[in-house]
């Protein structure tokens, strides 16, 4: 017989971890289910050494540091954590929800979905023979191992710009983007323009030059032109973003806006008792940032507590008054 939880949180990224901690502070019985092999979501797995700029009060905070702080905060409570476990169905029963997963089943009074963009994998570089090259990378692990190496980065979003600025401190760095304008925070773009990073726009990669195992040069072609250039490099980083999959979400019977769960001001979905927070939810004016999701977590938790027991106030005491 499965234990009955007050709140089951689907997703163990930053927003899910904070929601679990906050739920414990409301003395709820909580568990976390995550399809990934470790806690922390994208910041922990894809950006462990990248600085995160939208967590107030913590300058120069990396994805790994954020994850470790949230886990440390949660470790003060007993929280069952189910990793490598994918939620398949969420069924409403008389007084609780039955969650069917790839490994079993769970009973819970309420559900908070904090699954971000879902399962993710990097958008690949689509050039001939790309699979064989060992020095083409899609994420950064231990940035110091690239010190003094010639680094080239492909992409024009926040990740590409931020990594270019990070690599510039330790290595000769080139950034290639197919457009003249970057899709990144204005402050970061200004810092890039004032940096020593070699910027190649509007160029796109056109040919890999190497022995099939080690890439030595990258040919780039100017957009809408036959003009080409060749870049010498030791490592190539592809920052084209990620393909996300929400998996079985569409089968959970919730109203969606494209692939996001529509919520009201309580962070409640179209099914009473099921809430959504972070990048997986949608409402008018929604901004996808870690900081936004962290703020949505207490709203969902407090309303879940009130759903379980209407005698419990939605507005709790402030932690400073406890």
Swiss-Prot record:
Cofactor comment text: Binds 1 FAD per subunit.
Recorded E.C. number(s)? 1.18.1.2
Q: Which cofactor does it need?
A: FAD
**Reactions listed under catalytic activity:** 2 reduced [2Fe-2S]-[ferredoxin] + NADP(+) + H(+) = 2 oxidized [2Fe-2S]-[ferredoxin] + NADPH
Which GO molecular function, any one, fits this protein according to its record? flavin adenine dinucleotide binding
Protein family per UniProt: Belongs to the ferredoxin--NADP reductase type 2 family.
What HAMAP family does the record tag this protein with? Answer: FENR2
Q: What is this protein called?
A: Ferredoxin--NADP reductase
Naturally occurring in which organism (per UniProt): Streptococcus pneumoniae serotype 19F (strain G54)
């Amino acid at each position: 017989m499965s234990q009955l939880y007050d709140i089951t949180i689907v997703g163990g990224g930053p927003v899910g971890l904070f929601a679990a901690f906050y739920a414990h502070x409301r003395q709820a019985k909580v568990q976390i289910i995550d399809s990934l092999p470790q806690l922390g979501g994208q910041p922990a797995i894809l950006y462990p050494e990248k600085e995160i700029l939208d967590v107030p009060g913590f300058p120069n905070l990396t994805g790994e540091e954020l994850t470790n702080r949230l886990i440390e905060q949660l470790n003060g409570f007993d929280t069952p954590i189910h990793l490598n476990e994918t939620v398949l169905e969420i069924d409403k029963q008389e007084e609780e929800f039955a969650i069917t997963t790839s490994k079993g089943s769970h009973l819970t009074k309420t559900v908070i979905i904090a699954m971000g963009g879902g399962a993710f994998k990097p958008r690949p570089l689509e050039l001939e023979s790309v699979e064989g090259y060992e020095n083409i990378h899609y994420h950064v692990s231990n940035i110091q191992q690239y010190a003094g190496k010639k680094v080239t980065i492909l992409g024009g979003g926040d990740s590409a710009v931020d990594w270019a600025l990070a690599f510039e401190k330790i290595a000769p760095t080139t950034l290639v983007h197919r457009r003249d304008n970057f899709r990144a925070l204005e402050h970061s773009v200004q810092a890039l323009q004032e940096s020593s990073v070699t910027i190649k726009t509007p160029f796109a990669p056109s040919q890999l030059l190497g022995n099939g195992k080690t890439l030595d040069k990258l040919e780039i072609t100017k957009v809408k032109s036959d003009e080409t250039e060749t870049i010498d490099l030791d490592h190539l980083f592809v920052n084209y973003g990620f393909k996300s999959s929400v998996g079985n979400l569409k089968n959970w019977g919730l109203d969606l806006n494209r692939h996001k769960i529509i919520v009201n001001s309580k962070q409640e979905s179209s099914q009473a008792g099921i809430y959504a927070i972070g990048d997986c939810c949608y409402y008018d004016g929604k901004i996808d940032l870690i900081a936004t999701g962290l703020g949505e977590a207490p709203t969902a938790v407090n309303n879940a507590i009130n759903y379980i027991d209407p005698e419990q106030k939605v507005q709790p005491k402030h932690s400073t008054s406890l």
